[in-house]
């Protein structure tokens, strides 16, 4: 979920945040479960002092997954394109194109073993980034494949493994649900009529299933784009004097820039929600400005690690309660964040359930300054019904799961009030927020 940031400019009017809603819809659903739309422009400023503007603009389509890195001219193996159609019959003595072990079949377009197949799939789903300690030129065999993951992944890509062939766990789950529904529909159509009343089975309509698939694809797109922004975030200070003024300012800048990335995700995800762009520009602004912090907290809870009691942003940055305090946040705000994240973690929600909860939170008709409340309520009802049907299928033996999930949205309203107090406290500490966050949270200097 991300939106784009323009380069720093000298001045930004108080209404600059409203420029973000001149757009045409981006349809992640049309791209399929494994494709998305990315913007390849510099989005993070070098400092938080410059003015930022957010924009909902149409984008050029590219691949969902990050581009494979540019490789030096290979000498040992060149990628071979395989013709479309069924895989050729295996003779039993074929070798893996990556490590030379015994191949089991064609996986992700390449003849490979089960080990390299699983390694490639895990690496793509996790967006893993490995580091070679030998200069990136390790010869790959059954021994070295365990020693150097970077060179192994490079060899997988060079052999021709295609990232777009990898389905995420959530897409696999949705695919199974779709197959189960088709089987149920077929069994219902051919089963003989009986006198007993038919059993009412929870079902997702084709429209609901398609919508959920679109939301999951949009989430993956936005998360990958935000991950690419991590190198532009002000680094966490490692200073001889951690209590120095410079170190405190750097920690605060680090957290505010992470918040900017999160706001980008929210806006970019919202504009891909079916029905959002059909609302008036004023209602789009009102919904996003008031739901932003609640959606940020939902996303934060997804990254909670109960073992270390820490929260990880952009896959590389992990923080505990003490780190939040060092960045200038109050314990009255820190503790509720971690408690909410812990309680959400106990629900063990998947990507589809999180995406639907976020959509329900965004389409809240009782937000201030919403004009067409009836239409917003209708849109929210669509997502509530989809979540109810999905949860009934995904948690058939837990009838309280659906109400527990909706109650989390009530808890978010309380946390939103605590956040307002935190923003006020930052102003008292003379800590200035970047223009984008000031506009989203209505902070007037």
Curated annotation (Swiss-Prot):
Entry-linked CDD domains: NR_DBD_LXR, NR_LBD_LXR
Subcellular location: Nucleus; Cytoplasm
GO biological process annotation, one example: positive regulation of transcription by RNA polymerase II
Expression sites by tissue: In adults it is expressed in spleen, pituitary, lung, liver, and fat. Weaker expression is observed in several other tissues.
Residue ranges of DNA binding: 93-168
Native source organism of the sequence: Rattus norvegicus
Superkingdom as given in the UniProt entry: Eukaryota
Function text: Nuclear receptor that exhibits a ligand-dependent transcriptional activation activity. Interaction with retinoic acid receptor (RXR) shifts RXR from its role as a silent DNA-binding partner to an active ligand-binding subunit in mediating retinoid responses through target genes defined by LXRES. LXRES are DR4-type response elements characterized by direct repeats of two similar hexanuclotide half-sites spaced by four nucleotides. Plays an important role in the regulation of cholesterol homeostasis, regulating cholesterol uptake through MYLIP-dependent ubiquitination of LDLR, VLDLR and LRP8.
Protein name from the UniProt record: Oxysterols receptor LXR-alpha
Quaternary structure and partners: Heterodimer of NR1H3 and RXR (retinoic acid receptor). Interacts with CCAR2 (via N-terminus) in a ligand-independent manner. Interacts with SIRT1 and this interaction is inhibited by CCAR2.
Chain intervals annotated as zinc finger (NR C4-type): 96-116, 132-156
Main localisation: nucleus
Protein family: Belongs to the nuclear hormone receptor family. NR1 subfamily.
GO MF, one annotated term: DNA-binding transcription factor activity
Record keyword Transcription present: yes
Modified residues (Phosphoserine): 191
Residue spans of biased composition, Low complexity class: 189-200
PROSITE patterns: NR_LBD, NUCLEAR_REC_DBD_1, NUCLEAR_REC_DBD_2
Post-translational modification: Ubiquitinated by UBR5, leading to its degradation: UBR5 specifically recognizes and binds ligand-bound NR1H3 when it is not associated with coactivators (NCOAs). In presence of NCOAs, the UBR5-degron is not accessible, preventing its ubiquitination and degradation.
Keywords, comma-separated and alphabetical: Activator, Cytoplasm, DNA-binding, Metal-binding, Nucleus, Phosphoprotein, Receptor, Transcription, Transcription regulation, Ubl conjugation, Zinc, Zinc-finger
